Amino acid sequence: MTNTLHRQGNREDLKHDFVIFVHTAKGKNREGAAPKIREFMRICLKYHPVNMGDVKRGSIHQDDVEIDRLIAGQEDNTVAGAVFTDMETLQKVVEELIRADLGICINITGLLDEVKECCRKAGITRHSAEHSLGVWGAKDRLPEREVLEFNTMCGHGMVSFNLIRKMIEQVRLRRMTPKQAALMMAKCCECGAFNTTRAEALLTRMRERGFLDSSRTKHD
């Protein structure tokens, strides 16, 4: 299971949101995996991801994270990932990973048909696919859909609802640009799964078409 499965938004937005990450299995391929994880990150870095990191050491958008040290510090049990915004670039990453033949599990979060097509064009068939079953329970306690679109871009939900609302308000008041607000939110995401380009686009659209209205009906 991957917590990046729960990303929310419309299809057009999600067509520009792909997370690729590496995972090892204890007792299977974890021992001695650190050099392979480092190579995975080097390959991803070549294609200019909009975010990259791992949950233990943070992401490239955090002030004290330096990319070379981040890669050098990878360990056998690290879960590292990168975010891309188009299928063409993702395909190039997948093709290079195939050539590298690292022998560890590679996962991609994205629209199922888009990921399937990416794998087909790269010359492979995906091993399996997983779905999010959605949100269960007291859904009336969830924030507005617009807020959830930002919050679920962090696999651990560390971009708080209140911070998101504050960033929206700062953009509305023109105290911050959409890009500045998106980068501020990304600092809270330790795993590096937050898509800053998508967040900037969402904020720009909200500025052009109308901002969050707290009186709207919340998540259905």
Where are these regions (language model features)?
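Conserved mixed alpha/beta catalytic, RNA-binding, or beta-rich assembly cores of soluble enzyme
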Residues: 1-170, 178-197, 209-212
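C-terminal domain-closing interface element
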Residues: 201-220
